[in-house]
Amino acid sequence: MIEFSNFYQLIAKNHLSHWLETLPAQVAAWQREQLHGKFKQWSNAVEFLPEMTPYKLDLLHSVTAESEEPLSDGQLLRLDKLMRNLMPWRKGPFSLYGLNIDTEWRSDWKWDRVLPHLSDLTGRTILDVGCGSGYHMWRMIGAGAHLAVGIDPMQLFLCQFEAVRKLLGNDQRAHLLPLGIEQLPALAAFDTVFSMGVLYHRRSPLEHLWQLKDQLVNGGELVLETLVIEGDENAVLVPGDRYAQMRNVYFIPSALALKNWLEKCGFVDVRIADVCVTSTEEQRRTEWLTTESLAEFLDPNDSTKTIEGYPAPMRAVLIATKP
């Protein structure tokens, strides 16, 4: 069973200690009542992985761990098999002792777009909301963060994160909790909060922005990345049943409308840092995700539209400050 005691001990000694008033009971309830039917299969894969300490570790330019001596064919095959038990792998890529996990998303491309616009992460305590497998948390650590805490209710992501952590020498600088943002008290304890690829899944996007603000210290920085459409400050798309085959997409504003939303929620120094169309090179089917991906979600005769006829996915990065 995946344990969270190391995280509890860690925050007991720092400015997150007040979280211990609610967090252990929430996690215990999750372990008791909410485990996915495949959770034991996934957690067994993590348990059977060897705990390895990298001879070389690069989290600044990638997530790459290397051993002093190459793994044997048998060791590499076993590693490959255990990590494939945790498919599908959506967020990465990871290069672990000669095993290259080519994930659906080139999350490194997103990080390269975001990083130049951030305040220096050195020494910061960071919250990553909807963190997926935790890829970006490792990159945050590589960029100098003191502690990265991720939350994501998807239990496969938790197991993927713990698998990677185990192969990175049980690194305790990043932690993933199986929670949603709505389960967090207003901690006001994080120097930087990331919400990337979450807002359009929220039925109440302004409430989500308030929840993110509640987690930041005064003067803290929000990094918001989400789907947007072209248009002025009043433009918002509310898709019908599906958008790019996703059922749970509620609001897709223009970047200018999103800037207004952030200002309405009391953020200051709001700026649109980047806008780019998602390509089928950045999100695609691989041997680590064998189901449909972006190419199948677009109109086969017009790649500027989704299969439903909406504008194809375009994503913006906005940076804002809590005063």
UniProtKB/Swiss-Prot annotation:
Pfam families: Methyltransf_9. One of its GO terms (biological process) is tRNA wobble uridine modification. Carboxy-S-adenosyl-L-methionine binds at K91, W105, K110, G130, I181, E182, M196, Y200, R315. It catalyses: carboxy-S-adenosyl-L-methionine + 5-hydroxyuridine(34) in tRNA = 5-carboxymethoxyuridine(34) in tRNA + S-adenosyl-L-homocysteine + H(+). The keyword Ligase does not apply. Disulfide bonds: none annotated. It comes from the Bacteria. Keywords: Transferase, tRNA processing. Homotetramer. PANTHER family: METHYLTRANSFERASE, TRNA U34 CARBOXYMETHYLTRANSFERASE. Catalyzes carboxymethyl transfer from carboxy-S-adenosyl-L-methionine (Cx-SAM) to 5-hydroxyuridine (ho5U) to form 5-carboxymethoxyuridine (cmo5U) at position 34 in tRNAs. Belongs to the class I-like SAM-binding methyltransferase superfamily. CmoB family. This is tRNA U34 carboxymethyltransferase.
